[in-house]
Amino acid sequence: MARRLWILSLLAVTLTVALAAPSQKSKRSVTVEQPSTSADGSNTTPSKNVTLSQGGSTTDGDEDYSGEYDVLITDGDGSEHQQPQKTDEHKENQAKENEKKIQ
């Protein structure tokens, strides 16, 4: 009887831990707020909020980062502009083009 009770309690703990685990993939996000600037021609830019988000890690702790970022720029007027993703392949192609220009 004690053995069955021990097995049932172990099963209950296992289910509780499994249900409390975070989702399989989480995301990291960083928001950078630039200070407000004047528009008097003093070489300043309008205030923009920039958010970078990147894929997270799986529940087993293995990181799943491929170097891709979603960049969302929010202008001071509340409009948003989605920037294209720069992948590792795109960066490599750009580096090759730059090397050709130098030579």
From Swiss-Prot:
InterPro entries listed in its UniProt record: Cytomegalo_UL22A
GO cellular component, one term: virion component
Sites where a glycan is attached: 49
Result for mutant: residue 80 to N: In strain: Isolate clinical 21A, Isolate clinical 22A, Isolate clinical 29A, Isolate clinical 38A and Isolate clinical 56A
Gene: UL22A
Signal peptide span: 1-20
Effect of substituting residue 92 to G: In strain: Isolate clinical 17A, Isolate clinical 21A and Isolate clinical 22A, Isolate clinical 30A, Isolate clinical 33B, Isolate clinical 47A, Isolate clinical 48A and Isolate clinical 79A
Protein known as: Glycoprotein UL22A
Keyword list, A-Z: Glycoprotein, Signal, Virion
